[in-house]
Amino acid sequence: MNKIANTEVEINIFNLLKKLWKKKFLITFVAIAFATAGLFYSLFIVTPQYTSSTRIYVINPNTPNNSITAQDLQAGSFLANDYKEIITSTDVLEKVISSEKLNYPSSQLLQKITVSILKDTRVISISVEDANPKMSQKLANSVREAAVSKIKAVTQVEDITTLEKGNLPKAPSSPNIKKNVLIGFIVGAGLSTIVLVIMGILDDRVNTEEDIEKVLGLTSLGIVPDLNKL
């Protein structure tokens, strides 16, 4: 009994695959349509964003000159996480807003800033994203300067080195056009396939001679031809 049931399931899956294959051009068309929508969205709807990055290096205040150990590096890594919180603090953000005369709140500025710490180092990277490439560079440097001042005031650290100043981005960092087009293509192909599979599962019409024998349990004696096709 299980063998028969398994056979029927296999036949149903095979029939679904046959139906999908017959609709391959429709699936491709829908996928291309969604990919085109992703391209249109990337080029004409979403505003391109530019990212400028600056990096600083912070020395552990308890480390004597020229005597950095592995423990110092580990401690410095933990301190770097503290510095990360200081960089994104309201005081730093408000100072940047004041110095750059920005007309939006600190919460909006915070959304533009990404602070990352290179693994097992005390190097802190500050990235700022903005629709204007020059503004992203200006904000990155302003955030760095305000953050360095705040870190010195809070932790009594004096040795903070600027490894890199904010660069002027020449190309947008987002949107990722290739990624959006690929996502659109995959979503289009996936949705059209799912819809066709559901339609195939719900389709209980008798279409073939085999369907008649399966549903009624009777042997077919013959087929009446369609007169319109004669």
UniProtKB/Swiss-Prot annotation:
It is a multi-pass membrane protein. It comes from Streptococcus agalactiae. It is found in: Cell membrane. The keyword Membrane applies. Required for CpsD phosphorylation. Involved in the regulation of capsular polysaccharide biosynthesis. May be part of a complex that directs the coordinated polymerization and export to the cell surface of the capsular polysaccharide. The keyword Transmembrane applies. Pathway: Capsule biogenesis; capsule polysaccharide biosynthesis. Belongs to the CpsC/CapA family. Changing residue 115 to I: In strain: CNTC 1/82. This is Capsular polysaccharide biosynthesis protein CpsC. Its main location: membrane. Pfam families: Wzz. The chain crosses the membrane at residues 25-45, 181-201. GO terms for molecular function: protein tyrosine kinase activity. Keywords: Capsule biogenesis/degradation, Cell membrane, Exopolysaccharide synthesis, Membrane, Transmembrane, Transmembrane helix. One of its GO terms (cellular component) is plasma membrane. One of its GO terms (biological process) is capsule polysaccharide biosynthetic process.
